A protein has these predicted regions:
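Cytosolic catalytic domains that perform sulfur/thiol-centered chemistry
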Residues: 1-186
């Protein structure tokens, strides 16, 4: 079981500083689902050389990071996050990209777990390094060239899951107004 929480703190409307990233580790250590560990998307599972936040690292590096966290072929992994499932969903996709399918997302996440008064603990649990069978799926994430092709392909749909004000170009939160042409907002 892994807590995957990351917090984005929006400080102002300056598009050059859209948000500050904070690891959820401190809240995890204060109170977590019993027997869970923590996966830090920003510090441990992103490409540190990229100028962009949360960039997917090379798949070999990502697989090695998961292996070091104790994720391996002998286990089923349950992911959860606080205040929504976006962070656990992101890591679920990352696991699939390196060929790991034995993962689920906790319905309702940590917030629902607490509301149900289910067991929680304090502290930081770590798991031993595990055997991880690396089987990359290069088609799970696409690059800008694939997106350009999809924009001109009537059989492809590009979905944007950001808020409608960002999608419609009314909120400069990410520094550049607008959306990918032909994308639909959900």
């Amino acid at each position: 079981i892994f807590d995957c929480t990351t917090y984005l703190h929006y400080k102002d409307n300056d598009p050059t500083l859209p948000y500050i990233v904070e690891s959820g580790r401190e809240n995890y250590e204060f109170c977590n689902i019993t027997s869970s560990s923590f996966l830090d998307l920003h510090l441990d599972l992103s490409d540190k050389a990229s100028p962009f936040r949360f960039t997917l690292p090379k798949l070999e590096i990502l697989a090695d990071s998961f292996k070091k966290q104790g994720i391996g072929s002998d286990y089923h992994v349950i992911l959860y996050s606080r205040n929504g499932a976006q962070w656990s969903a992101r890591i679920w996709w990352m696991l699939r990209a390196v060929g790991f399918d034995q993962a689920s997302i906790l319905d309702g996440g940590f917030n629902q777990w607490q509301k149900m008064n289910l067991p929680t603990s304090k502290g930081n649990l770590t798991f031993s390094k595990s055997d991880f069978i690396f089987s990359p799926r290069d088609n799970i994430f696409v690059d800008k060239d694939a997106v350009h092709e999809a924009m001109n392909n009537p059989k492809c749909i590009i979905l944007n899951s950001l808020t409608s004000d960002i999608h419609n170009g009314k909120n400069p939160r990410y520094g550049r107004l607008g959306r990918i042409p032909t994308s639909l907002n959900i």
